[in-house]
């Protein structure tokens, strides 16, 4: 009887968890379409600014921090985009693992990485381990707004534009999860600054002419000067790229949460079925034992009467 009571208790608690998992899955399912659309809708704007920056970078004669790497400054900024909430499978752990790998590689190269973290789970992880963090942000990782992108981009741009002797950094990396589809989300490391010129794909045969740098992007006329345009467009470029990373990370987080809750719901239902079979087997064994005892008692009475 004690075994049956324990099984009933486990079935009841598992059924309660199954309802929670199923509700979380349905909530994530209702959010994923919007999160995916928001990320896709932001891409054209980001691509347009990226093309403009590429056109500026194509002017190889310019001397601007956006394209010039300070080899004398070993400090490097690394921004990790984690989540505020759990129940999203390996989402945050994958980001932290890739971030730790990047930090180790930078250390091997003789650089001094400075860590910035977005998301309560990541902040808690590094705080618990007493790891130094240069900047943290929390809130709405599954629905990030423009305000948080502005705050992050301002802090990172300030760090990048500072002189080396004032604690500035020479490079900026972002570790985030790129949304591919509902099943696939890839952890990526993006070096945002300094900007490198991306040339169009060339045929395998024949040399690459120098004029191809001018063909990397559409033609632009810059007024009053390339440097002044760079100064004006740099904050918008950083903010738009960070905002795009936040949005695709939010879509990835929601998809990961839906997949995790779907798996948890299936596992809970399988466990309920297994526990129910054990309970039924225990009941059947109890009934069989009781019948055996009754029949044995009846036989004993009959023998006494004889």
UniProtKB/Swiss-Prot annotation:
Entry keyword set: ATP synthesis, Cell membrane, CF(1), Hydrogen ion transport, Ion transport, Membrane, Transport
> Where does this protein have coiled-coil stretches?
none
* Main location as per UniProt: membrane
Q: Does the keyword Transport apply?
A: yes
Q: How does it sit in the membrane?
A: Peripheral membrane protein
Cellular component terms per the entry's GO annotation: plasma membrane; proton-transporting ATP synthase complex
Q: Which InterPro entries match?
A: ATP_synth_F1_ATPase_gsu, ATP_synth_F1_gsu
- Specify the domain of life of the species encoding this protein: Bacteria
Gene Ontology molecular functions: ATP binding; proton-transporting ATP synthase activity, rotational mechanism
Q: Show the stretches that span the lipid bilayer.
A: none
Function (record text): Produces ATP from ADP in the presence of a proton gradient across the membrane. The gamma chain is believed to be important in regulating ATPase activity and the flow of protons through the CF(0) complex.
**Subunit composition and interactions:** F-type ATPases have 2 components, CF(1) - the catalytic core - and CF(0) - the membrane proton channel. CF(1) has five subunits: alpha(3), beta(3), gamma(1), delta(1), epsilon(1). CF(0) has three main subunits: a, b and c.
What protein does this entry describe?
ATP synthase gamma chain
The species is Bifidobacterium adolescentis (strain ATCC 15703 / DSM 20083 / NCTC 11814 / E194a)
């Amino acid at each position: 009887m004690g075994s049956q009571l324990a099984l009933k208790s486990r079935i009841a608690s598992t059924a309660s968890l199954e309802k929670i998992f199923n509700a979380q899955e349905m909530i994530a399912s209702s959010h994923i379409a919007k999160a995916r659309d928001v990320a896709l809708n932001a891409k054209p704007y980001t691509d347009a600014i990226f093309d403009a920056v590429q056109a500026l970078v194509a002017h190889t004669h310019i001397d601007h921090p956006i394209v010039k790497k300070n080899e004398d400054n070993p400090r490097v900024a690394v921004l990790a985009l984690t989540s505020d909430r759990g129940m999203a499978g390996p989402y945050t752990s994958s980001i932290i693992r890739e971030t730790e790998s990047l930090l180790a590689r930078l250390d091997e190269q003789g650089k001094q990485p400075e860590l910035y973290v977005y998301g309560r789970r990541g902040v808690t992880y590094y705080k618990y381990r007493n790891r130094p963090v240069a900047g943290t942000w929390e809130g709405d990782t599954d629905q990030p707004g423009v305000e948080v992108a502005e705050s992050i981009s301002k802090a990172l741009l300030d760090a990048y534009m500072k002189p080396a002797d004032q604690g500035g950094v020479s490079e900026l990396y972002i570790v985030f999860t790129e949304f591919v589809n509902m099943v696939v989300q890839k952890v990526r490391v993006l070096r945002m600054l300094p900007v490198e010129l991306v040339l169009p794909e060339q045929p395998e045969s024949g040399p690459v002419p120098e004029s191809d740098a001018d063909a990397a992007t559409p033609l632009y006329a810059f007024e009053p000067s390339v440097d002044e345009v760079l100064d004006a467009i740099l904050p918008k470029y950083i903010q738009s790229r960070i905002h795009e990373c936040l949005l695709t990370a939010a879509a990835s987080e929601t998809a990961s949460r839906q997949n995790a809750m779907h798996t948890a719901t299936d596992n809970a239902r399988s466990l309920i079925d297994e526990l129910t079979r054990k309970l039924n087997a225990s009941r059947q064994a109890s009934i069989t034992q009781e019948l055996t005892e009754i029949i044995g008692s009846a036989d004993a009475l009959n023998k006494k009467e004889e």
